[in-house]
Amino acid sequence: MAEITAQLVKQLRDKTGAGMMDCKKALQETGGEMEKAIDWLRQKGLASAGKKAGRLTAEGLVDSYIHTGGRIGVLVEVNCETDFVARNEAFRSLVQDIAKQIAACPNVEYVSIDEIPPATVEREKAIAMGSDALKGKPENVKEKIVQGKMDKTLRELCLLDQPFIRDQSITVEELIKQAIAQLGENVKVRRFVRFVMGEGIEKEEANLAEEVAAQIAAKEAPPAVVEAPVAETPEPAVAETPEAKPAATESKPAKSKSAKKKK
């Protein structure tokens, strides 16, 4: 097997336009033989993708995918160079595959590793450095272990580094490179958003033990004594005293004239 040097990788890149990592992998897969490496890249659809990587992508498609049951939804924007390709069925199928890929990857937050904020990188590094597994190890060994853990963690956050759900032998990045070779235009995933039903809403989870204890206590508690209301004795009614009326004056009967004469 020929030694795979940086110069050999550069030669393959100049001949094919493929990315440096793709060229290195092609040489590794073919034992360092240039012609076989070129054929390998062509079979993977990577031979011309690198030449188109820097071209402007101002057209494209915004597509959506709703997973069965409506619990997960995805919106994704994928760009290409021309409206002609944007209306191509192969391009539309690629965008739909990418949307499904995002739905299937709950940890993915960024398109590529270049988009990860420095603060996130530093936080992951601090977590890796604080691992108990590093205690007692030399500093140079620690650096290698930490770098390996960080690379793995950060790549899990990136869409392009995920194994393609329909073909685990390639990544999403390699899938896109194949599409570039097939369509003859540069293709880029610009942005995406993944929705999960109920995400961010805190649900109050009942404690089963506490709930059972409360039910038992309610059953064992003695029945509450309900006191009958005391009827109020009505106050006796006060009889009203009738107002005194003036006594009637008795009138004496008048004597008749005949009685006076007899005297």
UniProtKB/Swiss-Prot annotation:
Region (Disordered): 221-263
GO molecular function: translation elongation factor activity
Coiled-coil positions: none
Functional summary from the UniProt entry: Associates with the EF-Tu.GDP complex and induces the exchange of GDP to GTP. It remains bound to the aminoacyl-tRNA.EF-Tu.GTP complex up to the GTP hydrolysis stage on the ribosome.
PROSITE patterns tied to this protein: EF_TS_1, EF_TS_2
Residue ranges, compositional bias (Basic residues): 254-263
Family: Belongs to the EF-Ts family.
Superkingdom assignment: Bacteria
Ranges of compositional bias, category Low complexity: 221-251
Major location category of this protein: cytoplasm
Involved in Mg(2+) ion dislocation from EF-Tu: annotated span: 82-85
HAMAP family xref list: EF_Ts
Lineage: Bacteria, Bacillati, Cyanobacteriota, Cyanophyceae, Gomontiellales
GO cellular component, one term: cytoplasm
Name of the featured protein: Elongation factor Ts
Organism: Cyanothece sp. (strain PCC 7425 / ATCC 29141)
Cellular compartment(s): Cytoplasm
